[in-house]
Amino acid sequence: MIQQQTYLNVADNSGARKLMCLRVLGTGNCTYGGIGDQIIAVVKDALPNMPIKKSDVVRAVIVRTKQPLRRASGMSIRFDDNAAVIINAEGNPRGTRVFGPVARELRDKNFTKIVSLAPEVL
């Protein structure tokens, strides 16, 4: 569960390393975000000489959470870290690679480009 002020790792090669969540996008007063939800975040740590700089406000989609995700089959899945992929206004990733596993639920939320770039889909 991701809320305001939560720090996330960046799971792509866009140049950012750490994000801090400013707002969870959704319907109404959406307090918490889970896998597949879009967030507005600020870049807290970035690599030098890359297009995304520190203190940039970006849009991202959550791909991993430490909070267990309950599936309809009864299985629950949990990751080791909270991570997000930076996206543009159309919902496509800004980077060209995605690092680490991502959840299958991203395909249901129409983030097929992120799923196809990921090395492992759980």
Swiss-Prot record:
SUPFAM superfamilies: Ribosomal protein L14 (SSF50193)
Taxonomy, superkingdom: Bacteria
Gene Ontology cellular component annotations, sorted alphabetically: cytosolic large ribosomal subunit
SMART domains reported in the protein's UniProt record: Ribosomal_L14
Annotated PROSITE patterns: RIBOSOMAL_L14
Gene3D superfamilies: Ribosomal protein L14 (2.40.150.20)
Matching Pfam families: Ribosomal_L14
Any one Gene Ontology BP term: translation
Keywords per UniProt: Ribonucleoprotein, Ribosomal protein, RNA-binding, rRNA-binding
Coiled coil ranges: none
Entry's Gene Ontology molecular function annotations: large ribosomal subunit rRNA binding; structural constituent of ribosome
Record's subunit section: Part of the 50S ribosomal subunit. Forms a cluster with proteins L3 and L19. In the 70S ribosome, L14 and L19 interact and together make contacts with the 16S rRNA in bridges B5 and B8. Can interact with ribosomal silencing factor RsfS, which may inhibit ribosomal subunit association.
UniProt record similarity statement: Belongs to the universal ribosomal protein uL14 family.
Role according to the record: Binds to 23S rRNA. Forms part of two intersubunit bridges in the 70S ribosome.
Protein name in UniProt: Large ribosomal subunit protein uL14
Organism: Synechocystis sp. (strain ATCC 27184 / PCC 6803 / Kazusa)
Lineage: Bacteria, Bacillati, Cyanobacteriota, Cyanophyceae, Synechococcales
Gene name of the record: rplN
